[in-house]
């Protein structure tokens, strides 16, 4: 927790060029394509070389999405109560470890805290059902809607 505070504080005091304005470009897609340079043809390096600030979704949302799908399966399909319980426990575990980082990011001058999964779900549900689970289903829609705001 202290390390998170120190790192966030250190980034907050790094000098920035006042005249440097970069267009922000969000990358969305399947998890492998978003994060693996070979799978995405080095898109991050290419965009940065072209002067863009690349915004990648945080990976934790993918794990929360996968866990939450067990709850959707129970509600809409034929999911098991055992998987729902495991899903909720796993999500609480992830949120517990993400909380100190979120607090530090909220206090930061330059960073934004992570949105709760419920906010991503609400964004997605404006366009489709969370029952869309193929690939990364509704999470892709939520990521696109988030970047569009």
Regions found by a protein language model. Give the residues of each.
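An N-terminal assembly and electron-transfer interface module characteristic of large anaerobic redox
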Residues: 1-149
């Amino acid at each position: 927790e202290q390390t998170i505070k120190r790192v966030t504080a250190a980034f907050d005091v790094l000098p920035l060029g006042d005249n440097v304005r970069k267009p922000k470009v969000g990358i969305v897609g399947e998890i492998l394509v978003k994060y693996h340079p070979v799978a995405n043809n080095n898109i991050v390096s290419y965009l940065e070389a072209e002067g863009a600030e690349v915004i990648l979704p945080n990976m934790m949302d993918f794990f929360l999405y996968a866990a939450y799908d067990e709850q959707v399966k129970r509600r809409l399909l034929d999911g098991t109560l055992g998987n729902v319980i495991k899903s909720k426990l796993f999500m609480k575990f992830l949120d517990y470890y993400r909380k100190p980082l979120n607090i530090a990011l909220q206090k930061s001058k330059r960073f934004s805290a992570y949105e709760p999964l419920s906010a991503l779900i609400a964004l997605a549900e404006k366009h489709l059902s969370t029952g869309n689970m193929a690939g990364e289903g509704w999470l892709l829609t939520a990521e696109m809607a988030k970047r569009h705001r």
